[in-house]
Regions:
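A cross-domain feature marking catalytic cores of carbohydrate-active enzymes
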Residues: 34, 73, 127-133, 160-162, ...
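Hydrophobic faces of well-ordered beta-strands that scaffold small-molecule active sites
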Residues: 28-30, 69-71, 125-127, 156, ...
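Active-site-proximal loop/turn and secondary-structure-junction residues that shape catalytic pockets
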Residues: 75-77, 100, 129-133, 162-164, ...
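Conserved alpha/beta catalytic core and glycan-binding cleft of carbohydrate-active enzymes
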Residues: 152, 164-296, 309-313
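Aromatic- and acidic-residue-enriched carbohydrate-binding clefts of CAZyme catalytic domains
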Residues: 43-50, 77-120, 124, 133-150, ...
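N-terminal structural segment of carbohydrate-active enzymes
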Residues: 1-99, 204, 215-229, 235-252
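Carbohydrate-interacting/catalytic domains
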Residues: 1-30, 35, 49, 56-65, ...
Length: 321
């Protein structure tokens, strides 16, 4: 095979960095978008929307009890096209950390600084790597190895349907790496139970006690794909008009319930019921067998105003606020 190039990086001082290496049973995870997590003017950090901004928020995450963060794509991708790409899915430059997420303009250094700071705080870093179908198995595996060895990343979230994912589970170089996959079974069952669908007890009991096998499955009721937890109890239907697709995009089946009023409400009974439902949802996630994962902002009622697909909303709608 012809060698077309090699990856070179400057020397970096990891200062005896040690990976926390928690058992899955001891993990409380937190799903965030690096830009959206601190981009809002009220985020109270100086380096808004960057890896450095995440570092500034580490004391908050520790106080919250988080010891693992799940980062949406942090590699280079095209943000501007026919439709803005805020999330980062699609074709990308997987081996290059995103320079726009760096306060100093050097994505390599900033990502390493973030990982090192997280480890010093006792927090693991898991990167979402949703490789496109045109990426070969070998390229995907090499990319995972690269981030593991060069950036000391603790794990990855992979597409369960891709051949590369199956290969990763058997790769010796990734033996001690946490390899996770998205599964919506827990989410859908618990949402239906929360809103009072009939005949859910047996399924709920199963998923409260279910543990994944080789695949690293984590439990969540909300993720970036869909409603936030506040919106889950505030809207019966999606409101994605701002995306410019006539409200045709995003999941149609959300298993949500607005508790008696669509959208924001000042009715005391509605607000009280919504607060109880939020607590019920968090109770189910945190006490079920398996690894719980919270969506950034759910802990204080972040809302996307009923938009359940903010893939193009690099603005207060898609930011945590």
């Amino acid at each position: 095979h012809e060698v077309r190039g090699i990856l070179e990086t400057e020397t970096y001082d990891w200062e005896n960095d040690e990976l926390p290496s928690y058992a899955n049973s001891d993990v409380v995870a937190y799903n965030l978008h690096v830009r959206g997590f601190t981009k809002d003017p009220y985020s109270q950090v100086s380096a808004k929307g960057t890896f450095e901004g995440v570092i500034e928020k580490l004391p908050y995450l520790k106080e919250l009890g988080i010891n693992q963060i799940h980062c949406m794509p942090v590699y280079e991708f095209e943000e501007r096209g026919r439709v803005p790409n805020y999330w980062g899915y699609g074709e990308a430059y997987y081996f290059a950390p995103k320079s726009a997420y760096s306060a100093c303009g050097n994505g390599v250094i900033s990502l390493k600084n973030m990982v090192k700071a997280c480890h010093e705080a006792g927090i693991e870093v898991v990167l979402e790597m949703p490789f496109e179908g045109n990426v070969s198995v070998m390229e995907a595996i090499e990319c995972l190895r690269y981030y593991r060895m060069e950036y000391h990343v603790d794990g990855f979230i992979l597409n369960p349907c891709m051949e590369a994912t199956r290969a990763a589970f058997s790769d010796p170089a990734l033996k001690d790496t946490k390899l996770l996959v998205h599964r919506t079974d827990f989410q859908d069952i618990m949402r239906r139970f929360l809103k009072g669908d009939e005949g859910m007890i047996e399924a709920v009991m199963y998923w409260l006690r279910h543990l994944g096998g080789e695949e690293g499955i984590f439990n969540y009721i909300t993720s970036h794909t869909g409603f936030t937890l506040n919106d889950l109890v505030s809207y019966d239907g999606k409101h994605n008009e701002a995306n410019g697709e006539n409200n045709q995009d995003g999941p149609d089946y959300n298993y949500s319930w607005n508790c008696g009023a669509e959208g924001p409400s000042r009715k005391k009974a509605v607000c009280a019921l919504r607060n109880r439902q939020i607590k019920n949802a968090l109770f189910l996630v945190l006490l079920a067998q398996g690894t719980p994962c919270l969506l950034a902002g759910d802990e204080f009622g972040n809302s996307q105003r009923g938009n359940n697909n903010v893939y193009c909303q690099d603005n207060p709608t898609g930011w945590v606020n």
